[in-house]
Amino acid sequence: MLSLERLYYFLLLKTGFSEQQAQDEIFYLRYNSTAYRDYQEDVSGEKYLKEALLPPKINELIVAEIQGKGVFSLSETWKSPLMWSHYADEHRGICIEYNTALIPHPNIAAVDYRSPRSIKASDLIAWKMKASSEAERRVYNTYFFAKSPEWRYEKEWRDISQSIGVTNSHFPVTAIYFGLRCASAVITSIVKLFNYERDISFFKIYPVDDSFSLKAYPINPDEVEVCGIRLPGSMIFGDAVLPQ
């Protein structure tokens, strides 16, 4: 039995297949790997089985196991015009800054823009069949942190959680940056909403003259409180009856 066959057989058993069912699946793939339906006689069958039939089957089982984890994507920088354009509604949105150093979190790491995309079969075999923690780490790093060099400008970091879906952030917010086209009403509303959090700073993005760079100027939240949109009277006074 080929090493990939053994790996696939092992994974099938882990997913609930009986030994007979797993063997039948292997024999079925062997049968379909040759043009003449004779795995023993057709020498090209083993190559086709190893390169074309087994890898997607193994990949399907591995992905099913690890795709249930959540990915929280972050960036090192707020200064990228491309990211403001792509991810912040063409500079109309906001950028939230987190402090990731206060709370230990072992699953946060920088994206590797030089790593190969494919996961090595030898690592899968060592992880699944030999319980190698180092091989498991390499598989996870490739799956979650490998990205094409073309994305290097994003300076991305990823925090991996045990489940997918919207959850509360582990990291405290330290600053909010408003895009250069962000509406004044949005800025006022957010500053008023978070102004009680004195540990949060606010910045407005502006273009640098004669270049494509961006700069951030601090916003004074007290000025926004005075000059910005005021709360309606019903929220300030509640059910109080005003004199006629």
PLM features: what roles do these ranges have?
Residues 1-244:
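Partner-binding and oligomerization surfaces adjacent to conserved cores of proteins
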